[in-house]
Amino acid sequence: MVSGSDSRSEPSQLSDRDLVESVLRDLSEAADKWEALVTQAETVTYSVDLGDVRAVANSDGRLLELTLHPGVMTGYAHGELADRVNLAITALRDEVEAENRARYGGRLQ
């Protein structure tokens, strides 16, 4: 006796379909959770205010804002201004590294 092209029974097919749909639902829910975490991380910013230089960066390391006090442009020589801006950026990096250590227990790579 020759069986049909599909040797599985109907209940087995429904059970397989239910399993696949369940896995797809779980994957979709997990993807939604990750998307929410990424969206939340994109809103995290770090800032430092040295009085004459203020800098803001996001969690990706992009400098979002750099504000200089009006007197900075005439009060500092080129090298001094570069040092102040670098100091602000270093302070931002230190803040991010401290949060990373507190949150994940390791250094930034």
UniProtKB/Swiss-Prot annotation:
Tree of life domain: Bacteria
Any Pfam family hit: DUF2710
InterPro entries to which the protein is assigned, alphabetical: DUF2710
Protein name, UniProt field: Uncharacterized protein Mb0031
